[in-house]
């Protein structure tokens, strides 16, 4: 149903890939959603969870790379790392989010593919919805400023921490690409 409906859409499409995504199924979906193999048409959104990112993302990238299918790759380190705190609040741990982001970039560097984007849920407000970060929001702080009506968001400080991490990872990625170009020349 959903795949059939999306085949006729002219807009770019994002396809979520979790730890249970099978390589063969993914290739079939890519071919259905992007039958003309157009660049920019389809972005695969990896949401594996911090403990699965290396093990589960590599086979997917490898299969797509071998197939010659054109996709963009994006990391969503939020959804695969949602947990329930002992207080009952739904939360996410900064360390887990950052580990998944690092893993996403590491796998792409290893596979010589492009880490094309990241997706974060965040707010500029000083909320206490995700634990960790330099101000050490912990489970006992969650009730202080837990304002979300849906999923836990990074607060302003946590968002900046993540922005600096991504900047470092992008710089490292760019430097690796430069080294490869020099090695080939």
Question: Locations of the language-model features?
Answer:
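Flexible, D/E/H-enriched segments
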Residues: 109-185
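Conserved, mostly hydrophobic/aromatic
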Residues: 15, 76
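Non-transmembrane, aqueous-exposed alpha-helical and coiled segments at domain scale
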Residues: 41-73, 79-128
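Active-site-adjacent beta->alpha loops and helix N-cap segments on the catalytic face
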Residues: 20-30, 52-56
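Short, small-residue-biased leader/transition segments that mark boundaries at the very start
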Residues: 1-4
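Short, surface-exposed connector motifs at secondary-structure boundaries
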Residues: 8-14, 36-43
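Conserved internal helical-beta-strand scaffold that buttresses enzyme catalytic cores
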Residues: 6-14, 21, 162
